[in-house]
């Protein structure tokens, strides 16, 4: 009876913080799934932007002054990154349009027409996508939101950010790298990915040593892991 009463009266509405947490958590799982199944780079961008919006209330869950500062930093830095990623996505579409090809963001079409894509626009698009999605991944030096967000959010939220949000952004970057490889621009992409990955690993290694907060240590560990992933695809293969 007690369980039925909770359901009838609306547990999520009577316990607002927990209700918001559960709703945002479910929204995050949905948007993360959309990122994984999307084969359209525009829809992929929308889904990654949605992950930012639904995870922000999770960082603010404790409702302290420090958590609201961390949330605003997460949003502002994330929005700058996602805006640059949008410009990069437009550049990929224009790389096809500039050569008289159909203007498309479907990954399969871009891969099929990759050799005919405009190389300058493709390179510009990849640079913007690397900076944009690299910000969401937390690659150094665009990682500034991570220590505060991980440190002030509940532990489970930090795990979701480390294992979910950053992985979604990495998937988007890997798909952009696929287009570069198909277009014969793998060397150009690797020249950007390798130093970025190494720098991220170095920064994380330097800053994690002085940390005493385990959640901030997780943040710098995530920076290092994202650097390893960038280094991995830069060395070869996506």
Predicted regions and their residues:
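Helix-loop-helix module between adjacent transmembrane segments
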Residues: 1-39, 131-135, 162, 166
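Juxtamembrane/interfacial segments at transmembrane-helix boundaries in multi-pass membrane proteins
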Residues: 2-13, 84-145, 170-192, 238
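Alpha-helical multi-pass transmembrane bundles of energy-transducing inner-membrane proteins
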Residues: 20-27, 33-121, 207-238
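Physicochemical signature of membrane-embedded alpha-helices that form the seven-helix bundle of GPCRs
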Residues: 24, 77, 128, 193-199
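Hydrophobic core segments of alpha-helical transmembrane domains in multi-pass membrane transport
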Residues: 32, 88-90, 128-133, 197, ...
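Functional transmembrane alpha-helices
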Residues: 40-56, 137-177, 191-238
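Residue-level signature of transmembrane alpha-helical cores of multipass secondary-active transporters
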Residues: 68, 74-78, 125-132, 159
């Amino acid at each position: 009876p007690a369980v039925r009463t909770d359901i009838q009266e609306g547990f999520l509405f009577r316990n607002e913080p927990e209700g918001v947490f559960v709703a945002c958590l479910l929204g995050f799982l949905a948007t993360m799934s959309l990122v994984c199944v999307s084969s359209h780079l525009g829809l992929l961008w929308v889904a990654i932007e949605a992950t930012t919006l639904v995870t922000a209330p999770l960082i603010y869950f404790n409702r302290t002054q420090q958590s609201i500062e961390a949330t605003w930093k997460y949003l502002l830095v994330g929005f700058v990154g996602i805006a640059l990623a949008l410009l990069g996505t437009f550049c990929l579409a224009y790389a096809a349009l500039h050569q008289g090809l159909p203007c498309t963001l479907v990954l399969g079409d871009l891969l099929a027409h990759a050799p005919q894509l405009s190389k300058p626009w493709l390179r510009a698009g990849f640079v913007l996508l690397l900076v944009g999605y690299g910000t969401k991944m937390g690659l150094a030096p665009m990682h500034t939101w991570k220590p505060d967000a991980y440190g002030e959010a509940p532990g489970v939220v930090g795990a979701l950010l480390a294992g979910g949000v950053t992985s979604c952004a990495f998937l988007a970057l890997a798909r952009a790298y696929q287009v570069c490889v198909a277009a014969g621009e793998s060397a150009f992409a690797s020249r950007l990915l390798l130093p970025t990955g190494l720098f991220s690993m170095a920064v994380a290694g330097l800053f994690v040593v002085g940390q005493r907060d385990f959640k901030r240590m997780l943040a710098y560990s995530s920076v290092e892991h994202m650097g390893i992933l960038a280094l991995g695809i830069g060395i070869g293969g996506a």
